[in-house]
Design a protein with these regions (language model features):
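N-terminal catalytic cores of NTP/NDP-binding nucleotidyl/phosphoryl-transfer enzymes
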Residues: 1-83, 230-251
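Flexible loop/turn segments at secondary-structure boundaries
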Residues: 34-37, 72-76, 138-139, 279-284, ...
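Hydrophobic/aromatic-lined pockets within catalytic cores
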Residues: 57, 122, 150-157, 161, ...
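Charged, often glycine-rich, active-site loop that binds/positions anionic groups
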Residues: 72-89, 145-146, 285
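A glycine-rich helix N-cap at a beta->alpha junction
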Residues: 86-124
Length: 486
């Protein structure tokens, strides 16, 4: 696949090959600290990387796609939406992997959040190689990288100070490492000295412990963030990793990491781009209250099919802020996806070839794949389209019975086949959830049983009489275009 599609993922893939040259394998990376619920904003990074991975593979490149769980970071504060707050507070300053799971489902707090994400990603066609930083650090796999940082600490100090004003420059003795106490597991420690080899001395202000560690065997030694990130770029030979706009600000962590990577680890920083924030609107009360206003990809998949969820990201440049809607705009988003689908299948004609190639590429990248490659449309049958608005009406007419709705659709002339019904079932589940949990009251209706008109209350009769001509016409359209066709 060439970058002539004009799609941002193809452009990024072409840039990676241009800057890194031809390689046997390209490594694309993403990652996050599982310090709380992994929300939809975090998901933007991983799907942005996955889309670039697909673009590289479409160019015939061999790609390693890694996702790092930074689960050896310190547990700094308890998120507001977590249960057992008092119990979690007892584990502040511990590594996240040493914090107990408050739901008592998984081995620890970090693993709980990791599992939640790892279970849902395949639903949207994302299957990276997961790397657990706690395991890497505790097995001393980074010992050489840590020692290199200690050897070059003056260089590191100069790099960090380059982006700081006089007031915030590093003062006095400074070390690029931190230590989790061997006795109490907290990071409330200070480095007392490095012997120039593998020995590192520290004392703990929390429990009074004093130790000298061998970094080749110790489990608690860790690089500070701005050094840890570039060290891992060199270790994994990362060619591409995007970052949020806060990291990409002048003097931000990407700026310093780029210099550290080259000047300390003798490795060129990966190709990158900045991704922007995501907003949400129209959240139903039930959804927002259950997770403390933190919206996850699982929440999004209750309203959007995996393909439409991918479409939101594939169709938007990463450096553009956008909003994921749960209100009436959901209908418009499904309509936009359906239009792109019709253009991709040449059911609808695009204005010109450029628009066709762009829409087709967005559609291709929106499709779920289990093998990490973009599914081909060659030899396949177009999906059977039922507009989301229409489907919502059909489900309400069937009193929420999805199987009846699908059976009625299959019974009409030229209705969907078995394979198409499977795709429609996914959309119908989203439509049912949206109607019952997100749609405004005026969008909802129910059919009265035969003779039900006589059971209308005086207030309901008055409301019917008060309908405007426009509203009466809308009722007629609903009757003629929906009910009478079932």
């Amino acid at each position: 696949m060439k970058a002539s599609t004009g799609h941002w993922a193809d452009e990024a893939a072409a840039k990676i090959v241009f800057e890194k040259g031809e390689k046997e394998q390209y490594t694309c990376a993403s990652g996050i600290t599982p310090s709380g619920t992994v929300h939809i904003g975090n998901f933007r990074e991983i799907i942005s990387v996955e889309l670039v991975v697909r673009a590289l593979r479409d160019m015939g490149k061999n790609v390693r796609f890694i996702y790092s769980w930074d689960d050896y970071d310190v547990f700094r504060k308890v998120p507001a939406n977590m249960p057992k707050q008092d119990e979690l507070e007892k584990h502040l300053r511990f590594p996240i992997t040493m914090v107990p799971d408050p739901w008592e489902r998984d081995a620890n707090y970090a693993r709980h959040h990791e599992v939640d994400v790892e279970k849902v990603l395949p639903k949207v066609g994302i299957n990276p190689e997961f790397i657990y930083q706690a395991e890497r650090y505790r097995s001393s796999r980074y010992a050489q990288g840590i020692r290199r940082a200690l050897e070059k600490r003056d260089v590191l100090k100069n790099i960090l100070d380059k982006f700081r004003d006089e007031e915030h420059k590093i003062q006095g003795e400074w070390q690029p490492v931190s230590v989790f106490c061997e006795k109490c597991n907290k990071d409330e420690t200070e480095i007392d000295g490095w012997d120039g080899d593998w020995g590192l001395s520290y004392h703990c202000s929390a429990c009074g412990c004093q130790e000298k560690l061998d970094m080749r065997k110790a489990k608690g030694v860790k690089l500070v963030w701005r050094i840890d990130w570039p060290m891992r770029w060199e270790y994994e030979k990362v060619d591409f990793e995007p970052a949020g706009k806060d990291h990409h600000s002048h003097g931000g962590s990407f700026d310093t990491a780029r210099h550290v990577c080259k000047e300390v680890y003798d490795y060129d920083a990966p190709v990158s781009f900045r991704y922007d924030f995501i907003g949400t609107k129209g959240l139903p009360g039930k959804m927002s209250s259950s997770s403390g206003n933190v919206i996850t990809i699982e929440d999004v998949l209750k309203v959007y099919t995996p393909e439409v969820a991918r479409f939101l990201f594939a169709g938007t440049r990463p450096n553009t802020e956008f909003t994921i809607s749960f209100d009436l705009d959901v209908i418009k988003i499904y309509e936009d996806y359906d239009k792109t689908e019709r253009i991709a299948w040449k059911i609808e004609t695009a204005k010109d070839e450029t628009i066709f190639q762009k829409e087709k590429r967005i559609y291709e990248l929106s499709q779920v794949s289990s093998d990490g490659k973009t599914p081909s449309l060659e030899g396949k049958q177009p999906p059977y389209q039922v507009p989301f608005r229409h489907l919502c009406n059909l489900i309400q007419i069937a009193d929420g019975d999805i199987e009846k709705t699908l059976a009625d659709l299959a019974a009409v002339d030229n209705g969907p086949n078995k394979e198409q019904l499977a795709v429609l079932r996914s959309r119908a589940l989203c439509a049912k959830y949206w109607v019952e949990n997100c749609a405004p009251d005026e969008f909802r209706f129910r059919l009265l049983p035969s003779g039900g008109a006589a059971a209308l209350s005086q207030e309901e009769r008055a409301k019917l009489r008060s309908l405007s001509d426009v509203e009466k016409n809308a009722v007629r359209i609903l009757r003629d275009d929906v009910i009478c066709k079932i």
